[in-house]
Amino acid sequence: MEDFVRQCFNPMIVELAEKAMKEYGEDLKIETNKFAAICTHLEICFMYSDFHFINEQGESIVVELDDPNALLKHRFEIIEGRDRTMAWTVVNSICNTTGAEKPKFLPDLYDYKENRFIEIGVTRREVHIYYLEKANKIKSENTHIHIFSFTGEEMATKADYTLDDESRARIKTRLFTIRQEMANRGLWDSFRQSERGEETIEERFEITGTMRRLADQSLPPNFSCLENFRAYVDGFEPNGCIEGKLSQMSKEVNARIEPFLKTTPRPIKLPDGPPCFQRSKFLLMDALKLSIEDPSHEGEGIPLYDAIKCMRTFFGWKEPYIVKPHEKGINPNYLLSWKQVLAELQDIENEEKIPRTKNMKKTSQLKWALGENMAPEKVDFDNCRDISDLKQYDSDEPELRSLSSWIQNEFNKACELTDSIWIELDEIGEDVAPIEYIASMRRNYFTAEVSHCRATEYIMKGVYINTALLNASCAAMDDFQLIPMISKCRTKEGRRKTNLYGFIIKGRSHLRNDTDVVNFVSMEFSLTDPRLEPHKWEKYCVLEIGDMLLRSAIGQMSRPMFLYVRTNGTSKIKMKWGMEMRRCLLQSLQQIESMIEAESSVKEKDMTKEFFENKSETWPIGESPKGVEEGSIGKVCRTLLAKSVFNSLYASPQLEGFSAESRKLLLVVQALRDNLEPGTFDLGGLYEAIEECLINDPWVLLNASWFNSFLTHALR
């Protein structure tokens, strides 16, 4: 239908219809029949006016386009097709100069010969039904109604048809042609059935009696009755004279609306300072797995058993030593903690029966690393009332950090494919109704695109770690429990695989409130040398713990194996959300689904199959300094998933604030791109609100950098 409209109607009419739909928040790609109806109505209004002039004697004459008498006065003033502000301005001007009564609703034309407003109707139904609806809505003697149908019928107030027979015949012929063209393309039935009646719901609710008196009493100042207020609201333009409206509201409010032009926005200012550091709860692209395929050992599925089995697959252990110290920590304690883990795992192996869980000995190094006895003593406030200089302790402002390239690399890596399958088909949920056949198909296509994705690995890793940590926090509150960091996947051939990333040691965890913190020490394997990007690993103490033999195209090579150790903390509420990271799959699937829906409504059939199977088509993925990046539909799926996963991994107040505030600026820029002529006040205040969220969070800084790329290319 959209293609038909663009071919059938004058481009100026199409542009006006697009503008009208955008003004009312309607999507022409979805509401295609409405798009066609608006274009038809606009064209009939213009045809009604065409060639009709008033001569010097005040008589109505018809003049063809090539006639030299172009200085004659147009008989009709066209109101339809203007934006609401301008349309009401024209109506008010006509009323002031002619003395005509102001209509309650915007009419389509004004007839200078008959001195009356005209409402034009074009209907796919019976003309008399549509006429009655219009008359019931307008409820005005002063607006003349003229209805045309696609079958050649017409109806007008008091059978006064205003125009000569030839002009009306031209309109009827055009409508009949549009109908024939639609029918030839199989569009007419859908178009005919889609017409809705005029909205008259408010007219049916007459307010009487006590409610009417209350309504009249509760009006804003300067309004004598409800009718006056209604008329004012109907004529009120949300985009017009906001300054005046604000100043009426309050003496303190003073806002000047500035036009928002292509040259108005400036880039968001990113902070200067040392580079930002890695702050996720576990390693992402730098993680290394010790894996076993087709596990069938005794106790398979018990984390500690699986961990010991994975540890046995590696033979390159060596005496550990520190290669990158933590600047503020007691680094020997981190080294001793790892040695203690190795020793206690060895002790377990020497036992006849391996226990299901392992509680670590409460050594001095672990007490230090887990902050045991470090919390300040809590004192009841009532016991402190008499202390004269009681005050909240001073806390330092967080140090500003600059964007670093590692976070973009992390994101790129999260979008990539791995050689393992991380989710089974049912991770997103089973069907619950027969109507979900299309939903199943979409889910299966989507799952196929993301099941190998590294972001999906992060989801399963996050779910496992948070579930294990929350369980241990509740079941062993006083113990320093050793928790293996494990994930499960399948190889391309379908063989099961169990992976060990490292270990967590949990501190004391008497978690009464959702926000109470449990400390933990994480120890994670990696092949990444921390000395290459030391700023990324500011919070870590990194040990070299072994040498790993790797097969490559040129044969075997030995690489040092590192252990990234750090103290960290989390809370019940954070673990609860971490356990639900599978929601990221659902969120990104819904985003893809809205893209499919938009495409399907244009083509007027379900486009799921074509959407996923047309490998030649590319889609916009995001903005970069080079411009709009495009890729396959699979790449779009994986990018959307990675964004959702990173929003979960790097969740923070800074991200919440930046997302909420930058969205406002985004909406204004989009309005500018849609030629809606937006206006703003206190744009500086909005920039301030955005930039106060840019402190030190790597994911927020990267999003701000992307936003700047978007601004650059959107406003060219």
From Swiss-Prot:
GO molecular function list: endonuclease activity; metal ion binding; RNA binding
Cofactor: Mn(2+)
Post-translational modification: Phosphorylated on serines and threonines by host kinases, including human casein kinase II.
UniProt EC number: 3.1.-.-
Summary of subunit composition and partner proteins: Influenza RNA polymerase is composed of three subunits: PB1, PB2 and PA. Interacts (via C-terminus) with PB1 (via N-terminus).
Name of protein: Polymerase acidic protein
Function, in words: Plays an essential role in viral RNA transcription and replication by forming the heterotrimeric polymerase complex together with PB1 and PB2 subunits. The complex transcribes viral mRNAs by using a unique mechanism called cap-snatching. It consists in the hijacking and cleavage of host capped pre-mRNAs. These short capped RNAs are then used as primers for viral mRNAs. The PB2 subunit is responsible for the binding of the 5' cap of cellular pre-mRNAs which are subsequently cleaved after 10-13 nucleotides by the PA subunit that carries the endonuclease activity.
Highest taxon of source: Viruses
Keyword Methyltransferase: no
Residue span of motif Nuclear localization signal 1 (NLS1): 124-139
Enzyme class: hydrolase
Gene it is expressed from: PA
GO biological process, one term: viral translational frameshifting
The family this protein is said to belong to: Belongs to the influenza viruses PA family.
Localization (cell): Host cytoplasm; Host nucleus
Listed InterPro entries: INFV_PA, PA/PA-X, PA/PA-X_sf
Gene3D superfamilies attached to this UniProt entry: Influenza RNA-dependent RNA polymerase subunit PA, endonuclease domain
Gene Ontology CC terms, in alphabetical order: host cell cytoplasm; host cell nucleus
Organism from which the protein derives: Influenza A virus (strain A/Udorn/307/1972 H3N2)
